[in-house]
Amino acid sequence: TYRGSDGRTSSPLATMKNALGRCGEESVFTVSALRAVGIPARQVYVPGWAHTDDNHAWVEVWVDGRWYFLGACEPDPDLNMGWFKEPARRAMLVHTRVLGPYVGPEELLDASSRYREINVLSRYAQAKPLVVRTVTKDGLAVKDVQVSFELYNYGEFYPLAKRMSDADGCCSLQTGFGDLLIQAQYGALGAWCKAQVAMQDTVILRLAPFPGQDRIVDLDFSPPITLPALDDTIPVQTYERHRVRLRHEDSLRSAYEATFIDSCSAARWARDLDLPADTLWTFLSASRGNHQEISRFIHDALQHHRRLLWPLLRVLSEKDLRDAGADVLLDHLVNAAKTIVLERDPDFYARYVLNPRLRNERLSSWRSLLVNNLTPAFRDSATVDPELAVEWVRKHIHVDDQDNYYHVPLTPAGVWRLRVADTLSRDLFFIALCRSLGLPARLDPVFEKPQYCPAGTHQWRSVCWEPETRLPAATANLLLSSQDPSILRPEYGTHFTLARYQNSEYVTLQLEGLSLQKSPLRLSVPEGEYLAITGNRQTDGSVLTRMMFFHLPPAGEKPLRLSWRHTSVVEGPLALLPPASRVYGVDGAEIDLNDLAHDRGLILAWLDPGREPSQHVLREWQELRPLYENWDCPIIGFIQESQRERLKACRLPKQLQLASDPENGLHRRIESTLGSIALKEDPVLLLIDRDEKIVLIHQGYQIGVGLRLL
């Protein structure tokens, strides 16, 4: 079943072992399962939606000479069905990778000697080629200009594809009928513009010195319009057979999940081992199908180095707990204990020395290999002067950025043995080497460059592999604040981002988790040219952006007050809640919706917890639970009885009350009052004010609904 998680993709067997995964993991699992029984299959991917801040992956399967699509682990009655079918009709790019020297009719997006990346958007949505022509200020064509076709998503302009202009200064991309930002870079020259693909066939970019002066630019970006829904009507008998299969599949998964360790067993084990029961249960419950490995690690760790057990487990992510092997964790615990460490801050030590995770790779055993192969002389000298570790890596590890074509990092053990690595794998190896020496090390969270702390300090120093790649020594303080109280929780990567101009392009700073809920916020960053982007996503999927270009001088402090644009159009009520709207709670008690709305307002929600769009809403309600409970607006949720079991693990706002809507009677009555608006896509959410007016309708797949309702 679906559960959102971090960016690391679990293996197919780990996904099966834990009975859950996000869309990328579910699609990798399904493709692997189909291929395992001889059925051709491939993963297709939308790198970013135009109408909401998210991406998605699903599966295509080859049947009788053609490709059909299906949801990864979300069965439908037939092929070419799925909740994502309608969102995909509004996509700007859908692509897949084909192994080998594939030659076909699809547009080629990327190629290497081992694979081709192809554009399959036209299988799902209306598409057309958008031509970009790069010229000088006098109109002369410029060849070999890098052109980036970018889509607003997650608070930044994400590059869907990059092209090089030909001798006529032209390049193109087959894309959807929405808006894109087009950027061109040619040495010290550049240009950018908004492209309205539905209205333009060609855009012309005139290259000029770039970046220019400080300025603010406001632009609106619209996704492809919503088209009338395709008819997916299936015979009643077929649908009933499908529901029977779903119930059987759910029972199989539930029976398997029942084999996971339970709280009573964990409590007994905690007593036997003299461990805190709550702490033990926190880790064992999170480990799901991997509980035997985590249990074995805990048991064996107690025999070796009990004091490091909890610190190591606490730095692991939930996904690590679900697929890390006991032997891997023991390798790090036992060999970290052998290392003399000068660090006195236990939390700092756990995060940057003990931690087996380097970035988002699968955890592996590397500490014992490095600890046992580093000579005492090197260990002693490098601990005193970590630049000796930098010099050792520079001298002994050859960098090859061509042959690791899938960009999956090599393990540090593999780099040690091969003495060859791509740039990222080299950087991760250096971090592993430092931690094996007992030195704190990490990837800089802003620019993802390797850093270390000299022994006994908390002063991060960036590694310089080559003189020309040195980060600017001069830094400055950026004082960020929000001047818009209507944005309740300005979140980085949702409402705003920052990018620094380097290597002829704006590179988004990696500041995940940053929030301006309590501002101002001081950031220490290198001086240079910056771009701040704010975006306000509208209910129709369009976004109002503000781009702030500015220079940050060295050794100074610059206040930056972020602001968000708002529509000047005030929408009236869409309809009224029908009179005498009554439903029944799960306890059988009658609920008068008109009275409820008149008292405190009301949210009505038709949800399918088995589908990803509804699961996003439920997850947002959990994250925003304090805000919702403080608001105290009643929420009536209509969920099929067979799906209510899925809510038991959710910590939802206390005012959410489940109810039944037999034969969708209330749903149909409300739909009849809305005229041309059909409530067909999962989920459906209505916000009703105290005058019983329906003031907001949300339906279908969209991120950020939880905040929008507030």
Predicted feature locations:
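A short, amphipathic beta-strand motif
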Residues: 128-139, 169, 474-488
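Hydrophobic/aromatic-rich core segments of domains that either
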Residues: 1-14, 18-111, 181-183, 376-381, ...
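Short active-site neighborhood of thiol/selenol oxidoreductases, capturing the structured segment around
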Residues: 593-617, 621, 634-636
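Short, acidic Ser/Thr/Gly-rich low-complexity loop/linker segments typical of extracellular
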Residues: 153-175, 502-519
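Short Pro-Gly-centered beta-turn/loop motif in secreted/extracellular proteins
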Residues: 64, 167-189, 195-202, 514-543, ...
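Short, internal strand/loop/helix patches
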Residues: 636, 648-682
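A short, hydrophobic beta-strand/beta-hairpin element that forms part of a small beta-sheet core
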Residues: 681-699
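Secondary-structure boundary elements
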Residues: 1-18, 237-418
